[in-house]
Amino acid sequence: MRKQKIFFNSTLPRSGSTLLQNIMGQNPEFHVTPTSGLIDLMLGARIGYNQNHESKAGDTEMWKEGFYKFCKEGIKGYVSSQTTKPYYLDKNRVWAFYYNLLSNIVENPKVLYMVRDLPSIFASMEKKFRLNPDKDDGTMDNIKLKGTSTHKRVELWAQTHPIGYSLEKLQQTLLDGTAKNFLFIRYEDLCNNPENVMKSIYQYLEVDDFKHDFQHISQVTVENDAIHGIYGDHIIRNSLNMLPNDSRDVLGQYTVDSIKTSYKWYNDFFGYK
């Protein structure tokens, strides 16, 4: 069996990570995952490593080397237990934020990072909120006047998981330089120019190119969206196309302008106007 390679999909929320997984899944060389808990096994091992009193009393460098090799072999074993395919694309948005740790475990880790026009991300959240008036997920509190308007909900999401956390950590990767190791993919570019985007992905991964069918994308990842609450939506459309940007209609011009002002760094770096 050929040596297996693991790659990472660490995408912003509501930015097409599941779509990308299923496009990549057309390639018979690739095993693609739904939202994965593999990173939690690595981080769980790190908790044990840091809290272990015996390691602190012994040769700390030996324990450190052992921890990294433990994680490395554990990831290899995990991947080989899931598939015999040579390439494994694991999806979890926080991989990028642990790049320095990951790079001590996986040689030259390759991270695909999809981004999207920020008002569209927030609008996607708001639409999910409106679609579920029977559910109370804690977003809105009429007593405390929390989340009682679209603008307030956007402000709340900007300060909490998953959007606020992801944007804060993304900005940190740009600051500390780890982002230079990622391949950033704009969702809009994938929809409008998929052939070129996929070519750039294969070049970055150093894998042979593959001809994809963007009008017949089968759903190969399976996910229980109930686990993710009202915002869970991991069902893809089977043909790739760019839907009209409705963020102004959903959020209002004032909130769209506020998002763009607050995240100027994001728009400047990724070329959004």
Features from the language model and the residues they span:
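Short catalytic/ligand-binding loop motif for oxyanion handling, primarily in non-cytosolic enzymes
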Residues: 18-21, 39-42, 96-98, 119-124, ...
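Glycine-rich phosphate-binding loop used to anchor ATP phosphates in small-molecule kinases
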Residues: 71-101
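PAPS/PAP-binding and catalytic site of the sulfotransferase fold
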Residues: 16-30, 102-106, 184-209
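PAPS-dependent sulfotransferase catalytic domain
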Residues: 65-81, 123-204, 263-265
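PAPS-dependent sulfotransferase catalytic core
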Residues: 1-76, 82
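PAPS-dependent sulfotransferases, especially Golgi type II membrane carbohydrate sulfotransferases
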Residues: 1-7, 159, 167, 171-175, ...
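Short His-Asn-centered micro-motif
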Residues: 10, 90-92, 115-116, 187
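Conserved phosphate-donor/acceptor-positioning beta-strand/loop module used by diverse small-molecule
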Residues: 91, 102-128
